[in-house]
């Protein structure tokens, strides 16, 4: 099985987004500041890294929307063992 290992979501108001996800879901939000592009890390589970990581839990982050960035929508990262075989499977099964 190839698990989802990370997610990212854009925001237009970082303080509001961080407060929302913290209040609604209890996520720990860590603002990385200007030096890191105002990225906000989202910790969704108490344990980080694979040992002791709750099954199905992943961490991710939020990034500011910018007019010159092409991909400004939520995205997921899936861990695979063999990227070439996975690309072939995607193409064979109608993916792009």
What are these regions (language model features)?
Residues 1, 54-56, 68-70:
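A generic structural micro-feature
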Residues 12-15, 75-96:
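Vicinal oxygen chelate
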Residues 31, 65-66:
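Basic, gly/Ser/Thr/Pro-rich low-complexity segments located predominantly at protein N termini
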Residues 8-57, 92:
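Core segments of cupin and vicinal oxygen chelate
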Residues 2-6, 71-75:
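Short, solvent-exposed beta-strand edge segments and adjacent coil->beta transition regions
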Residues 23-25, 66-70:
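A solvent-exposed interaction/effector surface
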Residues 46-49, 68-69, 83-84:
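Short, charged/polar surface micro-motifs in flexible loops or helix N-caps
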């Amino acid at each position: 099985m190839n698990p989802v290992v990370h997610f990212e979501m854009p925001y237009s108001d970082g303080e509001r987004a961080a407060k929302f996800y913290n209040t609604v879901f209890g996520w720990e939000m860590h603002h990385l500041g200007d030096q890191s592009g105002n990225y906000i890390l989202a910790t969704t589970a108490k344990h980080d890294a694979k040992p002791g990581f709750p099954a199905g839990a992943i961490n991710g982050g939020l990034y500011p929307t910018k007019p010159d960035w092409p991909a400004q929508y939520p995205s997921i990262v899936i861990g695979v063992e063999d990227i070439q075989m996975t690309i072939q499977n995607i193409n064979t099964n109608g993916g792009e």
